[in-house]
Design a protein with these regions (language model features):
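Aromatic-anchored, charged helix-turn/loop surface patch used as a conserved interaction hotspot
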Residues: 254, 259-276
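Active-site "lid/cap" and pocket-lining segments within catalytic core domains
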Residues: 1-253, 263-264
Length: 276
């Protein structure tokens, strides 16, 4: 996690912050299925952060109001975050947060998290930039985080909390970093064997797809991490395994690049996509 690692190197107290925004969960694109997955992720993240010395701080409220309150109480000097390509609602929220930081003298530092290039000047440069990002070294986690005992967390809303949408029908995919690593390993070693043959079949695709989309969307895996894991797995294949896994892993790697490319198009041409 680039922003967290960079923040930890400042040796200043850190607030690892997640904001539950009630207005977000009122939007038509929001789903309690998302929250079930995110809840798993946050519980996992809290445990991992606690091992470094500082628990996750959860706040419920409007993002700007939460940041403003934290700034008034704790004199926040910097905010470190990943770039994201969301929808119109999240875009407007991001702009509001940027204005708040600018007006209140808070330095906002954002880092890319995938192959999407913010303010790309030429499409001809995209593939080269994306490939260079995928080849960068996986960042280590911080050894420790200075504790911030004066900053108190709100209670993490329950999966069945009233601010979320309708109760989901059927099973919901389990989230969290540990589950993400297990799902990636399982796909590389087992499901990917017949990925190409069954990915378009409504019935069989359930058993041969990667199950990584939600992990990539909510950050329990990075695109770079998955791309490098594919390369590593291919290098370990025996001659017999290359016949069954090789082509399938290559195809999945291509689709992983498509994911970045499609999001890049949304980033670069949001108005055009809304019209069509």
């Amino acid at each position: 996690h680039g922003p967290l690692l960079t923040a930890s190197q400042s040796n200043a107290p850190i607030i690892p912050l997640y904001i539950v925004e009630p207005e977000y969960w009122k939007q038509p694109f929001a789903s309690r299925r998302h929250w079930h997955f995110i809840h798993d992720c946050l519980c996992d993240l809290d445990s991992a952060l606690a091992e470094m010395g500082q628990n996750l701080i959860v706040k419920v409220g409007d993002a700007c109001e939460v940041i403003k309150e934290l700034h008034l109480k704790h004199h926040v000097s910097d905010v470190y975050a990943h770039e994201e390509t969301g929808n119109l609602w999240t875009y407007k929220r991001d702009i509001a947060v940027e204005k708040l930081c600018l007006n209140d003298g808070i330095a906002l530092h954002t880092s890319p998290t995938n192959g999407v290039v913010r303010r790309l000047r030429s499409r001809d440069d995209w593939s080269k930039i994306r490939n260079a990002r995928m080849a960068e070294k996986i960042l280590p986690k911080p050894n420790m985080l200075p504790s911030f005992p004066s900053c108190r967390s709100d209670i993490l809303p329950a999966k069945n909390g009233p601010i979320f949408c309708d109760i989901p029908i059927g099973a919901v995919q389990k989230g969290g970093r540990k589950q993400a690593v297990a799902d990636l390993r399982s796909f590389l070693n087992y499901q990917s064997r017949e990925y190409l043959y069954h990915i378009s079949a409504p019935g069989l695709s359930e058993f041969h797809c990667s199950r990584l989309s939600a992990h990539l969307a909510w950050g329990t895996l990075s695109v770079r991490e998955v791309a490098q894991s594919i390369i590593k797995r291919r290098s370990q294949l025996s001659p017999d395994e290359k016949k069954s896994f090789g082509r399938n892993l290559t195809a999945f790697g291509t689709r992983l690049a498509w994911r970045c490319h499609f999001i890049q198009t949304i980033e670069a041409q949001p108005d055009s996509l809304l019209l069509h």
